[in-house]
UniProtKB/Swiss-Prot annotation:
Domain of life of the organism encoding this protein: Bacteria
Family: Belongs to the GPI family.
Keywords: Cytoplasm, Gluconeogenesis, Glycolysis, Isomerase
Catalytic activity from the UniProt record: alpha-D-glucose 6-phosphate = beta-D-fructose 6-phosphate
Enzyme class, first EC level, given as a word: isomerase
Organism: Pseudomonas fluorescens (strain ATCC BAA-477 / NRRL B-23932 / Pf-5)
The name this protein goes by in its record: Glucose-6-phosphate isomerase
HAMAP family, sorted: G6P_isomerase
Subcellular location: Cytoplasm
Record EC number: 5.3.1.9
Annotated GO MF terms: carbohydrate derivative binding; glucose-6-phosphate isomerase activity; monosaccharide binding
Cross-referenced NCBIfam families: PRK00179.1
Lineage, broadest ranks: Bacteria, Pseudomonadati, Pseudomonadota, Gammaproteobacteria, Pseudomonadales
Cytoplasm listed as a keyword: yes
């Protein structure tokens, strides 16, 4: 029976009990001692694939730990689950849908049936549609209402229609095509629109409205604001089609807005928003970096898909990262996971992975609606490397919580300045080393003696300088951030999230919690503007409504 129809209680599996027993045996495990005892530890716990090099040797694991985690993956039926997702079974059980983001990066000639229909020709038809549009804009053939070529593209979207495309277009800024600047408008806060509109000219700007329903509140409000601004700047209704296109499955609403049907790029219900950057949602990426680079991005993701499907679990990068997350979250009590990119252009990867991981695995019931028996997805947080060292790394080193971390770093910089990149890389490695090694009381006291402190001063200060160490981390190294490697990196985390959902028996492809907030928001809005005079369901919300109404002007 398919895993998504009859999810297991993972805590009842023999492999889970074996891991519980092993966790007790690992209570006094020391990474420092493990490295001293085994010169081959690094080679035993490293892996290279798809242009990525993973060092997972700085973890609270032995080869036995890895074997036990792999046994867990086998007992939960991970191989069948991977096949179910890739082949289009209804792995999104609550919505009765497949999750086929992997289809978006499959090559021409592949076949994949959904409800008896081969979807691959349609996938590549849309890719050709994107290619044509990108070519026209880059060649200056798409012109605005004053016949000037387009110089600025504004993507209006939120969530998956924003976070993934923004990550990729900024991460690949070194591949940006000259002549077209890409911007993102997501927040309904008017200040964001105000700042953006000051940077662009209506006559040379193309807006992409990205919303599957063409009814997402924030996106629709921003699209309406952009439309009003365009008209106020001298644009006309008759020429509006030159400045607005859409990525949506609601053609009627997009046409009613003023967008021509041939300029509406389709979305499919078998691709979730947080997995959609590979689709027409990635149009701003293609406009930013060019079509050949966009196809390289897809190709990189496809190589990771192939690795994920074919590599044995012991050598499978997404599977290993996922199982390590299960190990810490379910057996060591970790509640969060830090993403620490040591690359300026990857500064938004944490935001994308927050949505990817937390919206996917922030669940408390299994696929069949029964409560989970263990913790599920962690809080994902972090930020750019060296900046974080002077902010929150202190908590990683000496705080009371165990927080696993992923360090992500390139070997080559696109913008070398003196020896800056060598220092950047050194900082990345030294942080993971410090988390692992820590500093003992004896080492702290020895340092203070060398500085000439008295024994009384040493006794007072040494406890503050002790760093526990034994804090786990992974290090992902890429030679250089490229479209192909970035595609593999993002796909790596997509598959990691899926593997964990299979272990926990949850649905990684729905997000009902998000829907509740949307529903309640309408009622609060109606009370704020006075169109609904009934009281809110609770005194706190009503009190805050009254506070707003008593003070808001304009």
């Amino acid at each position: 029976m398919a895993y998504y129809r009859t999810p297991h209680d993972v805590t009842a599996l023999p492999a889970w009990q074996a891991l519980k027993d092993h966790r007790q045996a690992m209570q006094d495990f020391s990474m420092r001692e493990a490295f001293n005892a085994d010169p081959q530890r690094f080679s035993q716990f490293t892996l290279s694939s798809c242009g990525l090099f993973l060092d997972y040797s700085k973890n609270l694991i032995t080869s036995e730990t890895r074997d036990l985690l792999v046994n867990l993956a086998k007992e939960v039926g991970l191989s069948d689950a991977i096949k179910s997702m890739i082949t289009g079974e209804l792995v999104n059980a609550s919505e009765g849908r497949p999750a086929l983001h992997t289809a978006l990066r499959r090559p021409v000639g592949d076949k994949l049936s959904v409800n008896g229909v081969n979807v691959m020709p349609e996938v590549h038809k849309v890719l050709n549609q994107i290619t044509e549009l990108v070519g026209r804009i880059h060649d200056g053939l798409w012109r605005g209402y004053t016949e000037k070529p387009i110089t600025d593209v504004v993507n209006i979207g939120i969530g998956g229609s924003f976070l993934g495309p923004e990550l990729v277009s900024e991460a690949l800024l070194s591949y940006a095509q000259k002549g077209v600047r890409c911007h993102y408008l997501a927040n309904i806060d008017g200040s964001e629109f105000h700042e953006l509109s000051a940077k662009i000219r209506a006559e040379t700007t193309l807006f992409i409205v990205s919303s599957k329903s063409f009814n997402t509140l924030e996106t629709l409000k921003n699209a309406q604001a952009a439309r009003a601004w365009y008209l106020a700047q001298g644009g006309s209704e008759a020429e509006l089609h030159r400045h607005f296109i859409a990525v949506s499955s609601n053609n009627a609403a997009a046409v009613a807005f003023g967008i021509r049907e041939e300029n509406i790029f389709p979305m499919w219900d078998w691709v979730g928003g947080r997995y959609s950057l590979w689709s027409a949602i990635g149009l701003p990426i293609a406009l930013a970096i060019g079509m050949s680079n966009f196809k390289e991005l897809l190709s990189g993701a496809y190589t990771m898909d192939q690795h994920f499907q074919s590599a044995p679990f012991e050598q499978n990068m997404p599977v290993l990262l996922a199982l390590l997350g299960v190990w810490y979250g379910n057996f060591w009590g970790a509640q969060s996971h830090a993403i620490l990119p040591y690359d300026h252009y990857l500064r938004n990867i944490t935001k994308h992975l927050q949505q990817l991981d937390m919206e996917s695995n922030g669940k408390s019931v299994r696929q069949d609606g029964t409560p989970v028996a263990t913790d599920t997805g962690p809080v994902i947080w972090g930020g750019v490397g060296c900046n974080g060292q002077h902010a929150y790394h202190q908590l990683l080193h000496q705080g009371t919580q165990l927080i696993p971390a992923d360090f992500i770093v390139p070997i080559v910089s696109f913008n070398p300045v003196a020896d800056h990149h060598q220092w950047l890389y050194a900082n990345c490695l030294s942080q993971s080393q410090a988390l692992m090694l820590g500093k003992t009381r004896a080492e702290a006291e020895s340092e203070l003696r060398e500085k000439g402190l008295s024994e009384a001063e040493i006794a007072k200060l040494a406890p503050h300088k002790v760093i526990p160490g034994n804090r786990p981390s992974n290090t992902l190294v890429v030679e250089r951030i490229s479209p192909r490697r970035l595609g593999a990196l993002v796909a790596l985390y997509e598959h990691k999230v899926f593997v964990q959902s299979v272990v926990w028996g949850i649905n990684a492809f729905d997000q009902w919690g998000v829907e509740l907030g949307k529903e309640l928001g309408k009622g609060v809005y109606n009370r704020l503007v006075g169109s609904d005079e009934t009281l809110a369901d609770d005194a706190s919300t009503q009190g805050l409504i009254n506070y707003f109404r008593g003070r808001h002007r304009g």
